Amino acid sequence: MEWPARLCGLWALLLCAGGGGGGGGAAPTETQPPVTNLSVSVENLCTVIWTWNPPEGASSNCSLWYFSHFGDKQDKKIAPETRRSIEVPLNERICLQVGSQCSTNESEKPSILVEKCISPPEGDPESAVTELQCIWHNLSYMKCSWLPGRNTSPDTNYTLYYWHRSLEKIHQCENIFREGQYFGCSFDLTKVKDSSFEQHSVQIMVKDNAGKIKPSFNIVPLTSRVKPDPPHIKNLSFHNDDLYVQWENPQNFISRCLFYEVEVNNSQTETHNVFYVQEAKCENPEFERNVENTSCFMVPGVLPDTLNTVRIRVKTNKLCYEDDKLWSNWSQEMSIGKKRNSTLYITMLLIVPVIVAGAIIVLLLYLKRLKIIIFPPIPDPGKIFKEMFGDQNDDTLHWKKYDIYEKQTKEETDSVVLIENLKKASQ
């Protein structure tokens, strides 16, 4: 009898423990009331901030957490703070939904979600500028450019405003310029020693002075759209048919954050070889060592007795930056070696054909004379007879024109005087 009694008592204890545990855990899973006083505001140019108050009538044994996400249910977040901010270009409408719950478990059903939206500035969308983009040049200044909107006047005066966390207030860009169809503006933006500076962004807004066009916004992360200055070639040297190239990196950059392209043009082959370099360390004894911010590369198999021209360009790599597509301009070219005398080469090109043509003419004349000597002309007997009887034949042909039987139509009589009688008479 003792065993059934003990089993019943143990069973009762388990039921009590299970019931107590279930009651204690049911309270946090209760749906809480919605948040109150949800509002939205804009700071600087593109910093949107939502704030709210805790729900009224929330459970006393509930540690409130707030579940929020944007209208497309992206970038979900559960946090105890009663605010949320985001940097976003205000070119489109953006909404935030907020609800309350008692834990960080996403599977827990939050309260009714409260939504608050912010719309972009009013204006004709066709009047807003297009292709607004900015490039951070050599970590020293930023250059932005854009195209005018479709429904804008050609004489529109644009203004660019910018802000980042190192500035106390919004600044206006003064260096407005025009390049072809593009408008643009540049402003100083120097890298600071703050390690988190490059993790920030620059907020950009472009509008007109008269307020007739719709403002356009852009956010430029400082880890992207970075374009270094071209490097500077310091030294070229040959060693064992290898070309050693040493250059100075652009300021504000370290070598491990750059990717290099070395181009070598040879005057003899008239071709260029391109080498992509990730690590350019000056470890060979031919390189000048202990030089700050310099890089080196060895080009194999280069002909030292010809003229070789070298140029280099660089870009950022993904080890330090998010973007690796913007190449710098090419460096100034540097040459090493000797180029063959082009004047002598051209002179030879002109003289050789003349000499060859003269030799061909002389050879032809010589061959003709040699032919006469080897094959003399054969005498023609008929020619001899033609020369002997040629005149007689001509006279015969001449007399053939007259008829030998032609009769004299008139007879003439001449007197004959004896010469002897004339002599006697004279004596």
Curated annotation (Swiss-Prot):
Superkingdom of source: Eukaryota
CDD domains assigned: FN3
Keywords: Disulfide bond, Glycoprotein, Membrane, Receptor, Repeat, Signal, Transmembrane, Transmembrane helix
Entry's localization field: Membrane
Segments on the Extracellular face: 22-343
GO cellular component: external side of plasma membrane; interleukin-13 receptor complex; plasma membrane; receptor complex
Positions in the Cytoplasmic compartment: 368-427
Residues bearing glycans: 37, 61, 105, 138, 157, 235, 265, 293, 329, 341
Main location: membrane
Pfam families per record: Il13Ra_Ig (PF18001), IL6Ra-bind (PF09240)
Keyword flag Repeat: yes
GO biological process: cell surface receptor signaling pathway; cytokine-mediated signaling pathway; positive regulation of immunoglobulin production
Signal peptide: 1-21
Disulfide bridges in this chain: 62-102, 95-117, 134-144, 173-185, 257-320, 282-296
Stored InterPro entries: FN3_dom, FN3_sf, Ig-like_fold, Il13Ra_Ig, Short_hematopoietin_rcpt_2_CS, TypeI_recpt_CBD
Membrane topology (UniProt): Single-pass type I membrane protein
Known function: Binds with low affinity to interleukin-13 (IL13). Together with IL4RA can form a functional receptor for IL13. Also serves as an alternate accessory protein to the common cytokine receptor gamma chain for interleukin-4 (IL4) signaling, but cannot replace the function of IL2RG in allowing enhanced interleukin-2 (IL2) binding activity.
Domain comment (free text): The WSXWS motif appears to be necessary for proper protein folding and thereby efficient intracellular transport and cell-surface receptor binding. The box 1 motif is required for JAK interaction and/or activation.
Protein name: Interleukin-13 receptor subunit alpha-1
Source organism of the structure: Homo sapiens (Human)
Gene: IL13RA1
